[in-house]
């Protein structure tokens, strides 16, 4: 009789990420109180694989995707997953319609797990969005809404 694989629900993954986020916030707060004297023991985020994607596996764009933790299914959907430090267990982050969305999900999980030392797929994204938002607000745009790759502007008259 084949063994049934144990799966985690989305609540379990969200709970694990919440605990890592709290741990990182606490260790960063403690290091501020100590004056940075004692550093917490923390596993470094993984480096990028030199192998890259497996040739001939996944969808048509899988081989050219450079995002960490992101791969394409044979039917074209993109998935994101990250490994939990210490345990090595994969945390399923979800299925997405684009590699960009999957990379954003990976980045959020990486920030939750590794804190400030996280290696991100899109490290300049928050900085670029903040500068763009500041620039647009100075142009007297009343309403600015940024959603993934779309920007909606409504000019005041």
Swiss-Prot record:
<feature type="short sequence motif" description="Nuclear localization signal">
    <location>
        <begin position="5"/>
        <end position="21"/>
    </location>
</feature>
<dbReference type="GO" id="GO:0010286">
    <property type="term" value="P:heat acclimation"/>
</dbReference>
<dbReference type="GO" id="GO:0000976">
    <property type="term" value="F:transcription cis-regulatory region binding"/>
</dbReference>
<comment type="similarity">
    <text>Belongs to the AP2/ERF transcription factor family. ERF subfamily.</text>
</comment>
<keyword id="KW-0539">Nucleus</keyword>
<dbReference type="InterPro" id="IPR036955">
    <property type="entry name" value="AP2/ERF_dom_sf"/>
</dbReference>
<feature type="region of interest" description="Disordered">
    <location>
        <begin position="29"/>
        <end position="57"/>
    </location>
</feature>
<dbReference type="GO" id="GO:0005634">
    <property type="term" value="C:nucleus"/>
</dbReference>
<dbReference type="InterPro" id="IPR016177">
    <property type="entry name" value="DNA-bd_dom_sf"/>
</dbReference>
<dbReference type="Pfam" id="PF00847">
    <property type="entry name" value="AP2"/>
</dbReference>
<keyword id="KW-0805">Transcription regulation</keyword>
<keyword id="KW-0804">Transcription</keyword>
<feature type="DNA-binding region" description="AP2/ERF">
    <location>
        <begin position="66"/>
        <end position="123"/>
    </location>
</feature>
<keyword id="KW-0238">DNA-binding</keyword>
<dbReference type="GO" id="GO:0003700">
    <property type="term" value="F:DNA-binding transcription factor activity"/>
</dbReference>
<protein>
    <recommendedName>
        <fullName>Putative dehydration-responsive element-binding protein 2H</fullName>
    </recommendedName>
</protein>
<dbReference type="InterPro" id="IPR001471">
    <property type="entry name" value="AP2/ERF_dom"/>
</dbReference>
<comment type="function">
    <text>Putative transcriptional activator that binds specifically to the DNA sequence 5'-[AG]CCGAC-3'.</text>
</comment>
<feature type="compositionally biased region" description="Basic residues">
    <location>
        <begin position="40"/>
        <end position="54"/>
    </location>
</feature>
<keyword id="KW-0010">Activator</keyword>
